Amino acid sequence: MSTCPFNDVFNSTDSSMINTFLKNVQVLLEAASYIESAERKDGKCEHGYASTFPSIQHSSYQRQRKFRNKKCNNNHYRSTHNELEKNRRAHLRLCLERLKTLIPLGPECSRHTTLGLLNKAKAHIKKLEEADRKSRYQLESLEREQRHLRRRLDLLRDGGGSLEAERIRTDSMGSTPCSERSDRSDSDQEEMEVDVESTEFSHGELDSVSTASTSDLDDHSSLQSTASDEGYSSCSIKLAFSS
């Protein structure tokens, strides 16, 4: 499309130039009408420039539409919030009922508030933690004692053979002196019997023995009388004399 200044077109007497200008104006008008129809159809500008000012009817319709959409969104949000709140309260009641079955509440369990129930649960948890700590300490003590007893048992098993050998050796050493003492006593008894059998008395010795026996009898009678005076028993004196 050729271009030319407006003054030249208006002042020119050339018909070809005027026809060209008119054709260009017609093309521009067709393009403007096409764009306007497209804007009315789609509601937006395809060329990127500012669109024409919408009509009053169209703007009121848009406002009503936005208001309805906003109202629907608010109603949906409110219903969703109410549903979530209802589910939360139901879950909280369920948790509180389970908590009542887990902790000791006493006879007036129906009068407990949510805060009081949570405080009692907290105190009960502390008691359980303390009991668990004591149980772990006792378990560790028992494990240490068990290890100590196992070590002692292993030592006794390892030293059982040596202890048995030591006991047998001690028994054998204890039996040897006893046998020696019994053999010695038997030999001494045999020697005494031999000495008694080999002893021979002469006539003088027999007289001295008889005299000694007579004097012993006199002494015995005197001792018996003395013992009777002193309160001693004659049987005990006889036993002492015979010994």
Curated annotation (Swiss-Prot):
InterPro entries: bHLH_dom (IPR011598), HLH_DNA-bd_sf (IPR036638)
Organism: Danio rerio (Zebrafish)
Disordered, as annotated region: 164-235
UniProt GO MF annotations: DNA-binding transcription factor activity, RNA polymerase II-specific; protein dimerization activity; RNA polymerase II cis-regulatory region sequence-specific DNA binding
Cell compartment(s), UniProt: Nucleus
Gene field: mxi1
The protein's name: Max-interacting protein 1
Record keywords, A-Z: DNA-binding, Nucleus, Repressor, Transcription, Transcription regulation
Domain bHLH: 76-128
Bias (Acidic residues) ranges: 188-198
GO cellular component assignments: nucleus
Lineage: Eukaryota, Metazoa, Chordata, Craniata, Vertebrata
Compositionally biased residues, Polar residues: 222-235
SMART domains recorded: HLH
Keyword Transcription among UniProt keywords: yes
One of the GO BP terms on file: regulation of transcription by RNA polymerase II
Listed SUPFAM superfamilies: HLH, helix-loop-helix DNA-binding domain (SSF47459)
The protein's role, per its UniProt record: Transcriptional repressor. MXI1 binds with MAX to form a sequence-specific DNA-binding protein complex which recognizes the core sequence 5'-CAC[GA]TG-3'. MXI1 thus antagonizes MYC transcriptional activity by competing for MAX.
Subunit structure of this chain's protein: Efficient DNA binding requires dimerization with another bHLH protein. Binds DNA as a heterodimer with MAX.
